[in-house]
């Protein structure tokens, strides 16, 4: 069926989705608890929305649509508190983090939902390996053309979000040497990567999408695992590169960083996006995944080599007036702190060095989720 029209949204509104880990408190491994959690959540009023994810040791939550940082953070606190309460009743821990440090993918169970079963039949073992945990950020757009402009203008900032959110250094009991190992699992899927360079919504909808649908490869936008994708049914663009942070404060701060960036980009303060910008896209993405804030980027316009951490700090200075207008200065202060104190990946490595067991690392992640102010 044709791609639905792009819904008009209030510009720069935002929403957050978080994929969270469900932890057995007896051994700190993942546990297939989402059916029980979902049933219990469904019996009471929940301050947001919740859905199953591809395997039963995962849970996705989503906020409402918000305009400002304080509103978003307040709801995330309420959601966190509700999840912790339900988890305590079931003796299940809940935490962030882009990967679980030592779970084995072969132990995971596919959630009994038609779409998930179809995906599992198509992609085989990759589906269980997709037991990874990300944050998705939605930003409201007025029309499809604006959405595509922002989507491609943001491409040079994707490494910022990867490095700032990085929380997946460990996979199957090994330190991967990556700060965000999670994204390597996403890249295994054939429809991952980046969106085609199209700036006109009709051309995207009637040209690209209709052709892809005609091939039989895709049925909806859900079939694309792009780093950034338009969501016409919501009237948003959706960023999908972030690891799930260990705290809801960081989740809110990342959303507001994207909101302020979009506000800045809409004033045409930078050269227009171009297909050639993507010549360095995968390299820059790799640098952020592998080295985090210590990565080195190639600027897509000038080909100058720049330090990722310094590029974030320069961007924060540019965004200060936009954050003031959006009442999100506290959020950008949190981003600034990450550049100086380190990412969640650094925190997890520090805890492993301190305790020398990955079970202790998971326990520290559980504490971080509950400890949010």
From Swiss-Prot:
Domain of life: Bacteria
EC number: 6.3.2.2
InterPro entries given in the database record: GCL_type2/YbdK_subfam, GCS2, Gln_synth/guanido_kin_cat_dom, YbdK
One family name in Pfam for this protein: GCS2
GO molecular function: ATP binding; glutamate-cysteine ligase activity
Catalytic activity: L-cysteine + L-glutamate + ATP = gamma-L-glutamyl-L-cysteine + ADP + phosphate + H(+)
Signal peptide positions (record): none
Gene3D superfamilies tied to this protein: 3.30.590.20
Alphabetical GO biological process terms: modified amino acid biosynthetic process
Keywords associated with the record: ATP-binding, Ligase, Nucleotide-binding
Task of the protein: ATP-dependent carboxylate-amine ligase which exhibits weak glutamate--cysteine ligase activity.
Similarity comment: family membership: Belongs to the glutamate--cysteine ligase type 2 family. YbdK subfamily.
Name used for this protein in its record: Putative glutamate--cysteine ligase 2-2
